[in-house]
């Protein structure tokens, strides 16, 4: 069907845009690196909820997974796949928004990056919901479809928190600085509730692992860098452990033949 070929082509184009935008937005062609954009608001020192620098290495794994997905979905057997018909367009949108965030951070304003990443998070949540309506038939599908998009969703969850907090840090009155740790712990409590609920409902491990990865490096950042906050670090570690436990518990509740990443 022409529509199926169009879907596959749009996904390829979206992945290409994402990779080009990632290169441009990260400063690979001579521009400013992400950590230096927006007056340093997006750096590891930008707020109490910013992960330490090594956390962002997860993007390499996410991009690799999305590239593998793009190649896999373009193969003839996937052309008329009903699962891909349902979710392919949404994954394409998520890749476009992924690239658009980097372009926005590089050339536009911090509030607009919050808008773009919120749209990206909502789109990825939609992807996870659609994937939950039917199960992957093979392990390659579990890895490149469920796994890659699950990692993307989990990481963007914590990235949205960091991005939004960076913006609030810039616009908040100076008097609020004394309550920064309290607000940080409160936000982490919200992440805990939403993350556990998501893990138990979706019964997936990849989102929990990616979010926990970010939280772990958030803790490292607060213990070894600025702004220093032992309280925030401890809270982040607790949330990370509970999220992984909830993810494992969710997966174990699935039938063996219905394991999802």
How would you label these PLM feature ranges?
Residues 2-3, 75-76, 129-136, 247-261:
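Membrane-interface capping segments at transmembrane-helix boundaries
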Residues 13-21, 90-101, 118-127, 145-163:
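Alpha-helical transmembrane segments of multi-pass integral membrane proteins
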Residues 15-34:
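Alpha-helical transmembrane segments of multi-pass membrane proteins
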Residues 42-58, 143-152, 173-183:
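Short aromatic-rich membrane-water interface segments that cap or initiate transmembrane helices
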Residues 50-55, 175-193, 220-245:
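Membrane-interface transmembrane-helix boundary segments in multi-pass integral membrane proteins
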Residues 81-91, 203-208:
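Membrane-interfacial loop-to-transmembrane alpha-helix junctions, especially the N-terminal start
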Residues 100-114, 171-178, 199-202, 223-229:
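Membrane-interface helix caps and helix-loop-helix hairpins in membrane proteins
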Residues 206-218:
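Central hydrophobic cores of alpha-helical transmembrane segments
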